C-alpha cells in the first residue's frame, strides 16, 4: 500500500521515487524519536511546558504579543528566503561551469572580514536601515545569480559575505533594542528568540519543499527567483513594522581600531577563547560537510538516476543551525 502511494505521488509530482522514500524514512525517524522521547519523559510538549513555566511569573504587557508577532513575521520570511538560496546554489554553479570552491570560499572569507566592522556600522547608521540594506543586497545578489559569468558571481559572493553578517546580527540587535525601549520584561526576550529558533527550523524544512517546486517550474535558478520575491516581502514588512534604533552612544564614538582592540582584549579571556575556538571548529566541520553534500550525493546516485532534488538539500542546512 505504501509503495503504491509513493508511486502515485511520484507520478503526480514528477519526483524520483527515492526522494519520496527518503522523505518517508525521515518522517518515520522523527515519529520514532518522538515516541522514545515521550517514553523517557523528554517529549517536546514536556519541554515546552517547562520553558513556559519560567514565564508564568512574568506579566505580559499590553501590546507585546503584537510586537512579537511582527518581529517573528519579518524574521521568518527573511530566513525562509535565505534557506531557499542554499538548496540549489551548488548545482546552479555546476551548471554554469564555474569554479564552485572559489565562489564558496569567497563568501566565507568576506563574511569573516566584514564581521569585524559590520555591527558597529549598523549601530551607528541605524538597525532598521541595516535590515533594509540586507534586503536590498539579497535582491541584487539573487539577480546576479542569473548571469553565468564567474566575475559577476564573484561580486555576488562578496556582497553575500556582507549580507550574511547583517542577517545574523542586525535583526536580533534591532529586536533587543526595540524590546527594551518599550520597557518590556527582559525575560520575554528569551521567549521571543526561542520561538524564532523553532520557527527557523520549520522555515528550513518548508524552504526545501518550496525550492523543489520552484526548481521544477523554472530550473536551477527557480529557488533564487522565489527568494527575490520573499525578500521584497520582507523589506515591505520591515518598512511597515520596524522603527529606527541605534547602538550605544559610547560604542558609536569609538573608532574602528578602538573597537578592534577591545574585541581582542575580550578574546584573551580563556572562557571566551574556548567558546570561540569550539564554535570555529564546529562551523568549519559543518560547512565542509554542507559543501561536499551535493557532489557526494550526485556521485552516489550515478548518471543513470535523476540528480538529487532540492528536497534532499535542506538537510545540511537544518544541521547547520543545531
Tell where the protein language model's regions lie, with residue ranges.
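Cytosolic juxtamembrane N-terminal segment immediately preceding the first transmembrane helix
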Residues: 2-75
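A membrane-interface helix-boundary motif in multi-pass transporters
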Residues: 9-20, 213-229, 303-313
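Helix-loop junctions on the cytosolic side of multi-pass membrane transporters
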Residues: 35-44, 220, 227, 232-255
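Juxtamembrane intracellular "pre-TM" segments in multi-pass secondary transporters
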Residues: 47-65, 243-276
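Substrate-agnostic recognition of the 12-TM MFS/MFS-like secondary transporter fold
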Residues: 70-91, 103-122, 126-129, 134-138, ...
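Short extramembrane helix-to-coil loop segments that connect adjacent transmembrane helices in Major
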Residues: 92-102, 296-312
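A helix-boundary/kink motif common to multi-pass secondary transporters
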Residues: 126-127, 148-149, 219-220, 302
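MFS-fold secondary transporters
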Residues: 141-145, 160, 238
Amino acid at each position: 500500500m505504501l509503495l503504491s502511494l509513493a508511486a502515485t505521488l511520484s507520478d503526480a509530482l514528477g519526483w524520483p521515487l527515492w526522494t519520496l522514500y527518503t522523505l518517508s524514512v525521515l518522517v518515520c525517524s522523527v515519529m520514532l524519536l518522538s515516541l522514545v522521547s515521550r517514553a523517557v519523559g523528554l517529549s517536546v510538549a514536556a519541554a515546552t511546558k517547562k520553558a513556559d513555566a519560567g514565564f508564568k511569573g512574568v506579566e505580559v504587557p499590553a501590546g507585546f504579543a503584537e510586537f512579537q508577532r511582527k518581529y517573528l513575521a519579518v524574521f521568518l520570511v527573511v530566513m525562509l528566503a535565505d534557506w531557499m538560496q542554499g538548496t540549489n546554489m551548488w548545482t546552479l554553479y555546476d551548471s554554469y561551469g564555474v569554479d564552485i570552491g572559489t565562489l564558496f570560499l569567497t563568501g566565507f572569507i568576506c563574511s569573516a572580514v566584514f564581521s569585524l566592522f559590520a555591527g558597529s556600522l549598523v549601530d551607528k547608521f541605524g538597525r532598521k536601515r541595516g535590515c533594509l540594506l540586507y534586503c536590498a543586497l539579497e535582491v541584487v545578489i539573487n539577480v546576479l545569480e542569473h548571469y553565468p559569468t564567474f566575475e559577476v558571481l564573484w561580486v555576488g559572493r562578496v556582497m553575500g559575505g556582507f549580507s550574511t553578517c547583517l542577517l545574523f546580527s542586525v535583526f536580533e540587535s534591532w529586536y533587543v533594542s526595540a524590546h527594551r525601549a518599550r520597557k518590556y520584561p527582559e525575560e520575554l526576550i528569551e521567549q521571543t528568540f526561542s520561538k524564532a529558533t523553532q520557527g527557523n527550523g520549520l522555515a528550513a524544512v518548508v524552504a526545501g519543499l518550496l525550492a523543489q517546486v520552484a526548481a521544477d517550474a523554472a530550473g536551477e535558478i527557480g529557488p533564487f527567483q522565489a527568494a527575490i520575491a520573499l525578500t521584497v516581502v520582507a523589506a515591505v514588512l520591515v518598512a511597515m513594522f520596524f522603527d529606527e534604533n541605534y547602538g550605544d552612544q559610547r560604542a558609536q564614538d569609538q573608532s574602528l581600531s578602538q573597537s578592534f582592540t577591545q574585541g581582542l582584549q575580550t578574546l584573551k579571556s580563556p572562557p571566551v577563547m574556548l567558546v570561540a575556538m569550539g564554535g570555529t571548529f564546529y562551523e568549519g566541520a559543518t560547512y565542509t560537510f554542507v559543501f561536499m553534500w551535493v557532489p557526494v550525493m550526485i556521485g552516489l546516485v550515478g548518471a543513470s538516476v535523476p540528480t538529487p532534488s532540492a528536497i534532499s538539500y535542506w538537510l545540511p542546512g537544518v544541521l547547520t543551525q543545531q
